[in-house]
Structure formats: C-alpha cells, structure tokens
C-alpha cells in the first residue's frame, strides 16, 4: 500500500516554535507541517505578525490549511498541554536526534533563530534535548531546515504511517 493517507485525529507529531523571529522560516515550516499532517504550535512573542505577507508567501497557498495554535508564552503552552512529551531540538543537546524514539503524540520544540530555546528550559529537560550533528564551529542550521530534518526522522520512525509514499508522473505513466 503506497498511500497511507487517513484522518489523523487529534494527535500526531507537533512542531513547536518558541518565539520565532523570521516570518519566512515560520512560513516554510508551516508548509512542511501541512505536507506532513503535522500541527504547528507558536509560542509568543513572535518577531512578526501572523498576517505578514512574507509569512504567507513562504507558506504559499498552504497557510490556510495549516493547523496552528498560538500561545501567549511558555507558561501558557505548559498549562494547555499538561504532561506532554516534548523533545527540545538544540545545538546544546547531548543526544543525537536520530538516536531517540519519537512517539506519535510527542511535541518537537525549536527555539528562536537568534538564541535557541532558553537554557532554563533545556536544563530542566536534559534527557529530551536532541541535536543535529554538525562539523566545526558552525553555530546552527537554518530553523526551517532543522525542523524538516528532525520531523522527517520522527515520521520515518513511525513508518510514514499517514503519508503518500509514491508519486505519479503528470503526462506519462511509470508503467509505460
């Protein structure tokens, strides 16, 4: 079966952006979320307005289909998601992102472009801090690229269980 599309119900992978600053990154992440059936959670303050044209342009015509929730702050997020399993993607993490198991209902959180996730949050959750390996003194990867890397690993671990696995040619057939 190459089409695993089905209703996702109330839970599946959730991407959390903690105080994102750049609308184009958030727009690109929104498009990735739509393409993967993933919910997007935004923790304020945001460095832009959700109505900004750059945000919509990066998300293209997919933005209207995005399942997005906005929180007033970190405390609001925690209050509205009690007991949530959260993985914190950070350059400071001690675990490689591909070495952990992502549950279907987990959250994967990414920090703002200029500073990442606050260290107080990371220190309180050392076992669920994950990092993408890099060489040398590279500070970090682009936020939208990081989200895609970690999200697709989480989806792979769960057998892409709600995704279409095979594409079709537009003018020709693979079988000709």
Please name every model-derived segment.
Residues 52-119:
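S-adenosyl-L-methionine/SAH cofactor-binding core of RNA-modifying enzymes
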